[in-house]
Amino acid sequence: MKCPKILAALLGCAVLAGVPAMPAHAAINSMSLGASYDAQQANITFRVYSSQATRIVLYLYSAGYGVQESATYTLSPAGSGVWAVTVPVSSIKAAGITGAVYYGYRAWGPNWPYASNWGKGSQAGFVSDVDANGDRFNPNKLLLDPYAQEVSQDPLNPSNQNGNVFASGASYRTTDSGIYAPKGVVLVPSTQSTGTKPTRAQKDDVIYEVHVRGFTEQDTSIPAQYRGTYYGAGLKASYLASLGVTAVEFLPVQETQNDANDVVPNSDANQNYWGYMTENYFSPDRRYAYNKAAGGPTAEFQAMVQAFHNAGIKVYMDVVYNHTAEGGTWTSSDPTTATIYSWRGLDNTTYYELTSGNQYFYDNTGIGANFNTYNTVAQNLIVDSLAYWANTMGVDGFRFDLASVLGNSCLNGAYTASAPNCPNGGYNFDAADSNVAINRILREFTVRPAAGGSGLDLFAEPWAIGGNSYQLGGFPQGWSEWNGLFRDSLRQAQNELGSMTIYVTQDANDFSGSSNLFQSSGRSPWNSINFIDVHDGMTLKDVYSCNGANNSQAWPYGPSDGGTSTNYSWDQGMSAGTGAAVDQRRAARTGMAFEMLSAGTPLMQGGDEYLRTLQCNNNAYNLDSSANWLTYSWTTDQSNFYTFAQRLIAFRKAHPALRPSSWYSGSQLTWYQPSGAVADSNYWNNTSNYAIAYAINGPSLGDSNSIYVAYNGWSSSVTFTLPAPPSGTQWYRVTDTCDWNDGASTFVAPGSETLIGGAGTTYGQCGQSLLLLISK
């Protein structure tokens, strides 16, 4: 997640380098918030929440941008902080709105009470931009309904790149945002099916992370008008099925600030590609729709989901409930100036976590303001939007960006050391607190059972910024976690030999599911989401082809600011003249094999199957360019790697011994020294040992074959002595990732394995490579 530098002023962000699952709650969206037609489509009811407003007026428009309102209606309090009004469709048509209905709100409150002489662009009634309670009402700022199901356009777009119109403060408070502001779109319920959801157990999944636009934007096999869209992505379902992928995880698709991406062609100006700047939690991003008419993005997204479901593929979404695109105050010295176009103008104290004095925002996200995730109403919005995406849009699971913020047990005003649930100030992760958002989500939704069935798959990015926010292994039962330690230790083992101490015990722990992180909380190996690379960092190829990041290069591969300096990457000696491209491919094969042969749920980044490169850029959040878009015209080496990846995934899927539902125990898994002796404490404790092997007793895990894996972390060859295979069988080679085996048949098809031998057979394994054998 990254704050685009071009949006820093608009968003007020800094550019910075055990609870059991319960049945779904009956009261999801119990306040019936949003805009909805009645059964006869004769009336539209508008309902919005604000605990502090003293007046709210509905503004209706015939278009989403550039026009004045056609009608206004004053809402009335409906109890429990809800404001409502019902408008006859006949009245809306009489006002000149005969097509889609666009709408927004203007709100008054304690810091800006209503004055009868107020008019758009007026300061009548103004008291302060922010009061002692933290209220930030400003009737000159049209407000997007947090429950809108579609959004007309982004605040910044080809017709408006001026973020000042949405700002408060002395210079901007009277600037009226009405014609520029994003507006909600009233939708007639869609009849588009999302198909039948797969019920596959998560342990059997292979996840493919990809950007919905980048997936097809330069795929020439797809008609031009569908490239980069939900429709186009749905056309790739067969591609993923052929690769062996069982779940596609899309980078954020909720409405985000990206309409200005194309304003300056062939430039990173105005760009926000990844999409971690959510403007609304219910709306599918309109930019990614081929059909951009009202209701088009919703139906098109649903049709895409149906296409994946028809192919047996789950659909996951990356969701960003830790902050919003409104950001924080524009500077740390002026509390009055902040962006207002939705949550902040309706109920700042409900939706954001305020610092002591209520003038600024507490921030563990790098974007300027924590979403107030310990607040019940803010949690309602999270739960309601998740339910909408799961039930109406057909989504099968969610990856939560900076999920540690959803474990925050602090509320506004609880900032002293004596506050019982905030010992560290304005942020405290507390998985034992039943009221934090991560536990509320577990109560509201059914998590998919271990053996499969209906329910959601939940994935946490288990860290944020500051405090006790690094929580890898700290989430409660029901949550799976992105295992950053798996990524780091694997990269270190392959790329840092001689530069840092490498622990073969960590490699063994990674191979077997990371029990040190997940077992004590009652979780299983598959709760570890194992990855080498994802969007946030280098690609698989670059991990093994780059000596650090290069983010300052020219378009289309840069420039990008930020990015970590801790990459654990290495070009395999290419720049030093001791390595070659074949060595880089060997390292990439070894890394991917390590991932796919490990217990846990593997996650790969889109394009890794053909060695996609970003030319060492490790933070390409701002590049809506050909560098970030997948390509399907490959070299011979890329095609060979695709075949390797495809067969490797198929092997994983064919062998249940690699996908255990519980931790390996007893004779199910045996670790060996290269000599063939069982690894003992002396071997494990010797940090000079960089080679290890293991055998999985397949029949004890429902597998027809036993499996032997040898990993040589040394730079030179090591001889492994093979243990005894099951009685009546011998060991056969499936793959050896060494350079000699580079080509189209690095990973052989089933039935084409090469006989190696039985107990006591020796095998010379080249440096920094992996050997895979099966018994038969």
Swiss-Prot record:
The record marks D536 as: Transition state stabilizer. Its EC number is 3.2.1.68. SMART domains: Aamy. Binds 1 Ca(2+) ion per subunit. Gene3D superfamilies: Glycosidases (3.20.20.80), Golgi alpha-mannosidase II (2.60.40.1180), Immunoglobulins (2.60.40.10). It is an enzyme of class 3 (hydrolase). One of its GO terms (biological process) is carbohydrate metabolic process. It catalyses: Hydrolysis of (1->6)-alpha-D-glucosidic branch linkages in glycogen, amylopectin and their beta-limit dextrins. The keyword Signal applies. Ca(2+) binds at D154, E255, T256, N258, D285. Disulfide bonds join C410-C422, C546-C616, C738-C766. Residues 1-26 form the signal peptide. Induction: By maltose. Coiled coil: none annotated. Its cofactor is Ca(2+). Keywords: Calcium, Disulfide bond, Glycosidase, Hydrolase, Metal-binding, Signal. It comes from the Bacteria. GO terms for molecular function: isoamylase activity; metal ion binding. Monomer. Belongs to the glycosyl hydrolase 13 family. PANTHER family: GLYCOGEN DEBRANCHING ENZYME. This is Isoamylase. It comes from Pseudomonas sp. (strain SMP1). The lineage of its organism: Bacteria, Pseudomonadati, Pseudomonadota. The gene is iam.
